[in-house]
């Protein structure tokens, strides 16, 4: 016979939520750091094309 599951406590729910938030903060800060390095032309491991090169090749 089917038995309902026990309810998750508030503290456990908050702990899981905080772990998820910390993961997202870490990922967001990495993405922001990469964006800053690209904008300041300091990125050494990320290759990209600039608009100047694209516009010169089309003309």
UniProtKB/Swiss-Prot annotation:
The entry's keywords: Chloroplast, Plastid, Ribonucleoprotein, Ribosomal protein
Protein family (similarity comment): Belongs to the bacterial ribosomal protein bL32 family.
Protein name (record): Large ribosomal subunit protein bL32c
GO molecular function, one term: structural constituent of ribosome
InterPro entries: Ribosomal_bL32, Ribosomal_bL32_plant/cyanobact, Ribosomal_zn-bd
Primary location group: plastid
Region of interest (Disordered), residue spans: 1-20
A GO biological-process term: translation
Cellular compartment(s): Plastid, Chloroplast
GO cellular component terms, semicolon-separated: chloroplast; large ribosomal subunit
